[in-house]
From Swiss-Prot:
Its cofactor is heme b. The gene is katG. It comes from Vibrio vulnificus (strain YJ016). It catalyses: H2O2 + AH2 = A + 2 H2O; 2 H2O2 = O2 + 2 H2O. The keyword Heme applies. GO terms for biological process: cellular response to hydrogen peroxide; hydrogen peroxide catabolic process. HAMAP family: Catal_peroxid. This is Catalase-peroxidase. InterPro entries: Catalase_peroxidase, Haem_peroxidase, Haem_peroxidase_sf, Peroxidases_AS. GO terms for molecular function: catalase activity; heme binding; metal ion binding. Formation of the three residue Trp-Tyr-Met cross-link is important for the catalase, but not the peroxidase activity of the enzyme. There is a cross-link at residues 98-226 (Tryptophyl-tyrosyl-methioninium (Trp-Tyr) (with M-252)). Bifunctional enzyme with both catalase and broad-spectrum peroxidase activity.
Length: 723
C-alpha cells in the first residue's frame, strides 16, 4: 500500500477574505494600471496621532536643553548588546543622520530627512544603511521619554548634530519641524533595478550612454546613499569616482566645496566596519524573522559586535582620533602615499604606506593595539581630482575655514528638504538668511482686497489669462521639499519667466498689467497674481450661473533676483503639465503618469486632481490655447461639461496619432472634439471614471464648483506655511 505523506502543519479553518500580501493584488494582475495610490498616502487611517494632534504645539512643550543633554550623555553610554566604538556612539549617530538626509535629490525634491522615512522600507533595509537600525534602537529610550514632543525625523538629525558637538565641532544650528510619516512612501522612484547594488551594466540600469545617470536619481546604485566607496561598480579608480561624486552631490544640491567638506567631515569621526565574514550576516530588517524584532544584519555565527562588526565591508578609521573633531583627515590624506588593500571582509580600501605608529588609530576595544587608517575611493578622489584637491588643500591649511564650511554644509544637508524658514522651529535656528532656503520677504496684509479685485476685473485680461497665470505661478510647488509655489512671485524672474511651459510672451503681457495694479495698491505681485486667478475662477463660476467667493489669504511677498538661485530653480521647470494639457515633448513615460506625478507633488488627492482637470479645461487655460479636452460649447464658464461629455455614450473615441484622439458622434460620424491621453484617462481608468461620474451628475453642478474652488485654493496656498 502506497504511503501518502501527512501534512503536519494545520490549515487555517477560516478562509480569509483579506488580501494581506501583494501576491494577488490588482497591481500584480494589471501592473501597467495607473497607480493612484501615490495620491492617497499618509492619511488619518494610518496615523495613530489623531486629527487634533499638532506637532508644532507639542514642540512648544519640549525642554530642548534637557533633550540635548540626554543625547550627549547617550553618546558615551555604551551598551553591551551593541558596544560603542572607543566608547562613543558619535560616528554611528552621524552616519544615521547623514544617510537620513542624504537620500534627498533636487530633481523632484523627494527623499531626505523631513519625514523620518529611514524607519521604513526600503530605506531601513538598504545595504548602505546596514546597522543603522541599531542607532535608532539606541535612541529609543530618549524617544520614549520625550514622546510626542520630538518626532523621529527631528530626533535622528538632532542626534547627528549632538554627536558632532560632543566631539568638538561648533555646528551652524538646528531647526525642529520635521513630521513623521507612518508607512513607506509610495511615490519615490529609487530606480528600476531588481537587485541590490546592481552594477551599471546590469539589466534595468540607471545609466545610459557614457555613464549618464537617470533623472531624478542621485545615488549610483540601488541601495546606496551616494557613491560606491570601493569605486565605480566596485572597481577602485579615484578619478572615475570623482566624476560620480560630482554628479551625485550636484543632484543633492551641493557644489564642489560642499562635496569635499561633507565627505571629509563625515569621515573625520567614526569608522567603517568590515572585520569579519559578511556571509555570516543575517537578513535585513524587512526580511528578518519575527524574533529579530525589526533588527537586521544580525550575526549569529560569530561575535559580530565591537571590533568584529561587519557593515560596509571596509574596515578601519579615517583619522588618528576618531572621536574628536579635528583636521586629522586631511593631515593623513596629504602626509602619506596610499595603496590598495583588501579588508578582512574582502572590500577594496586604501591604506597608508609606511605610516608612523603614532598616526595609527587605536583599536575600538583595546587602546594598546593600533591599526592602519583607511580611505575610500571617494576619499582618495579628494586628493587626486584637481578641483577637489585645491579645495582639500585649502581645508588642510585652514582648519577653521574647514570647520565653518563643513558646519554650513551639514546644516544645508540636514535641512534642505524642510523648505522655507517659516517651517523652522526652536532656539537654535540660525538668523542668517541662506539663498538655498528660497527666501521670500513678508508681504502686506492690510489692504482693500475688493478694490484690487475690481481693478483686475476692469483690466481687460481674459478669464483664461487670469487663471492660467495664477496656476503657472503656483504649480511649481513641491510638497516633497516644500519648494516652489506662488509666494515670492518668482514667475516674473529668471529662469521661470522664460520657461516654455509658462508661455513667455503671454506671461509678459499679463504680468505687465498685474504689476501695474500691484504698484498702484502698494501690494506684492505675488498676492496680485493669486487674487487675479481667484477673480478668474469667480467670473467663470458666475458665467455658469453660480455665485461663489474664492478664499484669499493676503501676505505673500515678492522675492528678488538676489534672493533667487537661478540654477537651483531650473529643476522646478515643468516638462509637462496635464492640468494645462501640455508637455514639452514626447516621453517614454505616458502623459497621464506625468500628470499623476505633478498632482502628487502638489499634494492633491485623486478627486482633487479630477475636479481641477475638469474645471481648468472648460475655463480655457490650455497651453497655447489648444482645444484638446475642451469638451464644452461655453468656454469660460465653470460648468461640469467636461465630465458630462466625457461620460456621454453618444460619443466614441478614436486615436489619430501619438497622444491624440478624436471624439466622434456615433450617429453622424462627425468629429465633435479632440483630446489627449490625459483627458481620456478620466473615462478609461475605473477609479477616475467613478469620480468623473460624480461630477457629471445633474445634481452635482454646484458641488463641482465648490470642490473646484477648494482644490484651487489648496494649490494657491500650498506654500503658505505662515498661515
Amino acid at each position: 500500500m502506497e504511503h501518502k505523506p501527512t501534512h503536519t502543519s494545520g490549515q487555517c479553518p477560516v478562509m480569509h477574505g483579506g488580501a494581506t500580501s501583494s501576491n494577488s493584488s490588482n497591481v500584480a494582475w494589471w501592473p501597467k494600471a495607473l497607480n493612484l495610490d501615490i495620491l492617497h498616502q499618509h492619511d488619518r487611517k494610518s496615523n495613530p496621532m489623531g486629527a487634533d494632534f499638532s506637532y508644532r504645539e507639542e514642540l512648544k512643550k519640549l525642554d530642548v536643553e534637557a533633550l540635548k543633554r540626554d543625547l550627549k550623555a547617550l553618546m558615551t553610554d555604551s551598551q553591551d548588546w551593541w558596544p560603542a566604538d572607543w566608547g562613543h556612539y558619535g560616528g554611528l549617530m552621524i552616519r544615521m543622520a547623514w544617510h537620513s538626509a542624504g537620500s534627498y535629490r533636487v530633481g523632484d525634491g523627494r527623499g531626505g530627512a523631513d519625514t523620518g522615512n529611514q524607519r521604513f522600507a526600503p530605506l531601513n533595509s538598504w545595504p548602505d544603511n546596514a546597522n543603522l537600525d541599531k542607532a535608532r534602537r539606541l535612541l529609543w529610550p530618549i524617544k520614549q521619554k520625550y514622546g510626542n514632543k520630538i518626532s523621529w525625523a527631528d530626533l535622528m538629525i538632532l542626534a547627528g548634530n549632538m554627536a558632532y558637538e560632543s566631539m568638538g565641532l561648533k555646528t551652524f544650528g538646528f531647526a525642529f519641524g520635521r513630521e513623521d510619516i507612518w508607512h513607506p512612501e509610495k511615490d519615490i522612484y529609487w530606480g528600476a533595478e531588481q537587485e541590490w547594488l546592481a552594477p551599471s551594466g546590469a539589466e534595468n540600469s540607471r545609466y545610459s550612454g557614457e555613464r549618464d545617470l537617470e533623472n531624478p536619481l542621485a545615488a549610483v546604485m540601488m541601495g546606496l546613499i551616494y557613491v560606491n566607496p570601493e569605486g565605480v561598480d566596485g572597481n577602485p579608480d579615484p578619478l572615475k569616482t570623482a566624476k560620480d561624486m560630482r554628479v551625485t552631490f550636484a543632484r543633492m544640491g551641493m557644489n564642489d566645496e560642499e562635496t569635499v567638506a561633507l565627505t571629509a567631515g563625515g569621515h573625520t569621526v567614526g569608522k567603517a566596519h568590515g572585520n569579519g565574514n559578511a556571509a555570516n550576516l543575517g537578513a535585513d530588517p524587512e526580511s528578518a524573522d519575527l524574533e529579530e524584532q525589526g533588527l537586521g544584519w544580525n550575526n549569529h555565527k560569530s561575535r559580530g559586535i565591537g571590533r568584529d562588526t561587519v557593515t560596509s565591508g571596509i574596515e578601519g578609521a579615517w583619522t588618528t582620533n576618531p572621536t574628536q573633531w579635528d583636521n586629522g583627515f586631511f593631515h593623513l590624506l596629504f602626509s602619506y602615499d596610499w595603496w590598495l588593500q583588501k579588508s578582512p571582509a574582502g572590500a577594496w580600501q586604501w591604506e597608508p604606506v609606511n605610516i608612523k605608529e603614532e598616526d595609527k588609530p587605536v583599536d575600538v576595544e583595546d587602546p594598546t593595539i593600533r591599526h592602519n587608517p583607511i580611505m575610500t575611493d571617494a576619499d582618495m578622489a579628494l586628493k587626486l581630482d584637481p578641483e577637489y584637491r585645491k579645495i582639500s588643500e585649502r581645508f588642510h591649511k585652514d582648519p577653521a575655514y574647514f570647520s565653518e564650511t563643513f558646519a554650513r554644509a551639514w546644516f544645508k544637508l540636514t535641512h534642505r528638504d524642510m523648505g522655507p524658514k517659516a517651517r523652522y522651529f526652536g532656539p537654535d535656528v540660525p538668523v542668517e538668511e541662506l539663498i538655498w532656503q528660497d527666501p521670500v520677504p513678508t508681504g502686506r496684509k492690510d489692504y482693500d482686497v475688493d478694490a484690487v479685485k475690481a481693478k483686475i476685473i476692469a483690466s481687460g485680461l481674459s478669464t483664461g489669462e487670469l487663471v492660467s497665470t495664477a496656476w503657472d505661478s503656483a504649480r511649481t510647488f513641491r510638497n516633497s521639499d516644500k519648494r516652489g509655489g506662488a509666494n515670492g512671485a518668482r514667475i516674473r524672474l529668471a529662469p521661470q519667466k522664460d520657461w516654455l511651459g509658462n508661455e513667455p510672451e503671454k506671461l509678459a503681457k499679463v504680468l505687465n498689467v498685474l504689476e501695474a495694479i500691484a504698484s498702484e495698491f502698494n501690494i506684492s505681485v505675488a498676492d496680485t497674481i493669486v487674487l487675479a486667478g481667484n477673480v478668474g475662477v469667480e467670473q467663470a463660476a458666475k458665467a455658469a450661473g453660480i455665485a461663489i467667493t474664492v478664499p484669499f489669504a493676503a501676505g505673500r511677498g515678492d522675492a528678488t533676483i538676489e534672493q533667487t538661485d537661478v540654477e537651483s530653480f531650473e529643476v522646478l521647470e515643468p516638462i509637462a503639465d496635464g492640468f494645462r494639457n501640455w508637455q514639452k515633448q514626447h516621453y517614454a513615460v505616458n502623459p497621464e503618469e506625468l500628470l499623476l506625478d505633478r498632482a502628487q507633488l502638489l499634494g492633491l488627492s485623486a478627486p482633487e486632481m479630477t475636479v481641477l482637470i475638469g474645471g481648468l479645461r472648460v475655463i480655457g487655460t490650455n497651453h497655447g490655447d489648444n482645444k484638446h479636452g475642451v469638451f464644452t460649447d461655453n468656454v469660460g464658464a465653470l460648468s461640469n461639461d467636461f465630465f458630462v461629455n466625457l461620460t456621454d455614450m453618444r460619443y466614441t473615441w478614436k486615436p489619430t496619432g501619438r497622444n491624440s484622439y478624436d471624439i466622434v458622434e456615433r450617429n453622424s460620424g462627425n468629429v465633435k472634439w479632440t483630446a489627449t491621453r490625459v483627458d481620456l484617462v478620466f473615462g478609461s481608468n475605473s477609479i477616475l471614471r467613478a469620480y468623473a461620474e460624480v461630477y457629471a451628475q445633474d445634481d452635482n453642478k454646484e458641488k463641482f464648483v465648490k470642490d473646484f474652488v477648494a482644490a484651487w485654493t489648496k494649490v494657491m496656498n500650498a506654500d503658505r506655511f505662515d498661515i
